[in-house]
Amino acid sequence: MSEHKIKRVLIAGATGYLGKYAAKAFKDRGYWVRVLTRSRERLFEPGPFTAPALEAEDIDDIFVGEISQPDTLTGLMDGIDIVYSSVGISRQRDGLTFEQVDYQCNRNLMDLCQSSNISRFVYVSMQGADNIMDLAITQAHERVVSDLRQSGLNYRIVRPCGYFSDMGVLYDMAAKGRSFLVGPGHNKMNPIHGRDLAEVCVDTAEGDEVEVEAGGPDIMTQREAAELAFEVAGKPIKITVIPMWLARGLVKIIGLLSTQFGDLANFIVTAGEIDGVGPKRGTTTLKHYFESLHAANSKNP
């Protein structure tokens, strides 16, 4: 980073699991940080699965706006050098589709960048997208990537192999005494902690590599991860396997009732079928993450 000019970064998705870590990571590297949010309050609240609450010193400027409504974003890019976005649906609540959020909201950011002096756009997509292009979430993410490639913007793509926040569900089930897996759980993965992934995002923003895959230090099957969760929770292993044929049938029924929930269910089921392994860029182990969840659970039973 230049010694003469502090670079300014915009964090879009700052109230999400990864976005909170990203804001802290950029600030720790000396950046001036602006966050885009619908809710000031949510910035300073802890998120699920040990996502941190941001502190006042983590943020230089709070821009309150609705990313789906460009008319609320006037001035958002003023003075900004780098745009970082991990905007996307993580938990389906508002009845919005992946197309409306994961694609269109990021497209709105890109359009704003075209008329500004942005030096780089950093976008968080997903690893292994080529293998699951039939999914609505993948199509939305990769439309953003395609648009970035054609935009003329200087861009970087980060492709995580899954998030520890998603693995938190395995600990929650184990702590309650029974875990449910879609399929036998033989698929291999190495998800990454949000803190480690945020560091990868900053490295990518500053580096020359255009697309970066990022995984954690542990490669294991989904079943092994579930068994590890029981070990940390101090509970006997009790795993119920939902057969793929049944899971696929349920996805179809859910899709008939709600396109949005059907798309999300389809993604969850497909994730139980395919491997998601990439370069080991994280250092935090899944066991350490489960232990942090267990410690928090013990304090607030």
Residue ranges with predicted function:
Residues S2-W32, T37:
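N-terminal Rossmann NAD(P)H-binding glycine-rich loop of SDR-like oxidoreductase domains
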Residues A271-P301:
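Amphipathic terminal alpha-helices
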Residues C105, G183-A205, V210:
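Substrate-positioning beta->alpha
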Residues E41-E45, T50-N108, L112-S115, D130:
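NAD(P)H-binding glycine-rich loop region in Rossmannoid oxidoreductase-like domains
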Residues E224-E273:
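Terminal hydrophobic/aromatic helix or amphipathic segment near a protein terminus
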Residues I89-A175:
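Glycine-/Pro-rich loop/turn segments that contact NAD(P) or position catalytic residues
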Residues S165-D172, D203-V212, K235-P236:
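Glycine/proline-rich active-site loop of Rossmann-fold NAD(P)-dependent oxidoreductases
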Residues V182-N187, V212-M220, F230-G234, I242, ...:
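Glycine-rich Rossmann NAD(P)(H)-binding loop
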